[in-house]
């Protein structure tokens, strides 16, 4: 997979793309990162990439020419997904991460200032994505979130690919609790079932705890889920435990 990032602050990505899972994925040549300062594509001798909005108002607006020149110069006739990070975009979720992970080439545009010239949205971008109902200084941090969630889904990116499958949201449920040594710490004990070596019982416990946690913290996820007979049985047990 190739990932291109267009930003006015390329230095923000240096540590992120060379560390942890992203750095290892790059070393394994599972992903090829390219970070470009789109100010370099300004025709102004001062590198201007923004201007005042028509009709008045506060703030500055990113001009279309530098971004069109930068992105089209890279992609040519190819049509990769060009993603604009902005609070007006569709809410980001795991299913979208899985969809983007299937692409061979992704382009991210990270903006600043008041906003983008609307022609960028209409004629250059294929996707607008938001990571939440709040405003950040720019799109860089949001792009990092999306890139991390996509790259970790690439085969070979994680030491144990099962981790990606079992993560919260991948199954439609929040993830079950994890424990490691020691078996007892300050009087708090690891559940006996996890020490039993009985794999079927362990899997049942994990599913039940995922359901318990999802029901308590994100009941909306259960409403969207096609429940199996086993899930229905375990949910009934959870209801009985309340009585």
UniProtKB/Swiss-Prot annotation:
KW Hydrolase (keyword) present: no
Binding site residues for S-adenosyl-L-methionine: 111, 131-136
Location(s) in or outside the cell: Cytoplasm
Record InterPro entries: Alpha/beta_knot_MTases, tRNA_m1G_MeTrfase_C_sf, tRNA_m1G_MeTrfase_TrmD, tRNA_m1G_MTases_N, tRNA_MeTrfase_TRMD/TRM10
Transmembrane segments: none
Domain of life: Bacteria
Catalytic class of the enzyme: transferase
Enzyme Commission numbers on file: 2.1.1.228
Keywords, in A-Z order: Cytoplasm, Methyltransferase, S-adenosyl-L-methionine, Transferase, tRNA processing
Disulfides per UniProt: none
Entry's family note: Belongs to the RNA methyltransferase TrmD family.
Protein's job: Specifically methylates guanosine-37 in various tRNAs.
HAMAP family: TrmD
Quaternary structure, from the entry: Homodimer.
Name assigned to this protein: tRNA (guanine-N(1)-)-methyltransferase
Organism name: Brevibacillus brevis (strain 47 / JCM 6285 / NBRC 100599)
